[in-house]
A protein has these predicted regions:
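Conserved catalytic-core motifs of GNAT/GCN5-like acyltransferases
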Residues: 22, 97-100, 112, 117-134
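Active-site-adjacent structural segments surrounding the nucleophilic cysteine of cysteine proteases
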Residues: 142-180
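Short glycine/proline-centered loop/turn elements that form peptide/ligand docking sites
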Residues: 81, 104-107, 124-129
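Short amphipathic helical patch at the helix-1/turn junction of helix-turn-helix
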Residues: 67, 101-102
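Well-formed, non-transmembrane alpha-helical positions, independent of function
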Residues: 5, 109-110
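Acetyl-CoA-dependent GNAT
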Residues: 3-72, 78-83, 87, 91, ...
Length: 180
């Protein structure tokens, strides 16, 4: 029922990188995620947003957001985005991130109007090799991110960076640690 409606909306909304039945089943049952739906009075699916949460971090991610063509322009995308942000705050996230195609101007307008700001790009991100613009928004302006400065320590072996990474982490946590 619901997965069929989600798959139908997915097929009508995206030309590439569509979620499959297996993707939806995993995300709805096993992942640390929330799938929020917008429906009309008859129970027809108008849109959905899929948000992912990472245990042990303050990051959340909009994985997918789609609104049916007939329901666009009615504020449904904005309402879904706001609902995902509220859910992320309940999950103790204070930063929401997402990726969007640079040619998806309607989505970019939605995200920028909601306070999302670009902070980077992924090259060759989508199936068709187009890039993605990365956006983020601080959901909790009252939460100040930790100022952890990690000093650089050059790798001393040619086979792994593990020891150097461990040294940098130790120095960041205990500044009096001597590197070298």
């Amino acid at each position: 029922g619901d997965i069929d409606a989600l798959l139908d909306l997915e097929a009508r909304s995206f030309e590439t990188d569509r979620l499959t039945r297996r993707n939806f089943q995993y995300l709805l049952t096993r992942a640390h995620a929330a799938c929020l739906l917008a429906e009309d009075a008859q129970g027809n699916l108008l849109g959905y947003v899929l948000a992912l949460f990472r245990r042990g971090t303050s990051l959340a991610r909009i994985y997918s957001l789609a609104v049916s063509a007939k329901a666009r322009g009615q504020g449904i995308g904005q309402a879904l985005l706001l609902a995902a942000e509220r859910t992320a705050i309940e999950e103790h996230a204070w930063l929401m991130r997402l990726e969007v195609r640079p040619d998806n101007q309607s989505a970019i307008r939605l995200y920028e109007a909601a306070g999302y700001r670009p902070f980077g790009r992924y090259l060759d991100y989508y199936e068709d090799h187009s890039e993605a613009v990365r956006y983020q928004k601080r959901l909790r302006p009252d939460v100040v991110p930790p100022e952890t400065r990690v000093p650089y320590y050059s790798q001393t072996t040619d086979f792994t960076c593990g020891p150097a990474a461990l040294m940098m982490a130790m120095k960041a946590l205990t500044p009096e640690t001597e590197l070298g």
